[in-house]
Amino acid sequence: MKHATAIAQLEIHASNCENNAVIQEAEGQYEDAANNRTNAADYRLAIEALQAE
């Protein structure tokens, strides 16, 4: 698959952001959690774009 390494790295980053968001929400860090959710969504969009090529 084209871009396999980049996609794998983006998957790792997206998962980390999603996991961090859950932790941050539990700790009351809502702004940081929202930022991580936005970043995760952006990573997922990048993954989709690379997979479409």
Q: Where are each of the predicted segments found?
A:
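A ubiquitous short alpha-helical element
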Residues: 1-7
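Short, charge-rich amphipathic interface segments used for partner binding and complex assembly
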Residues: 8-53
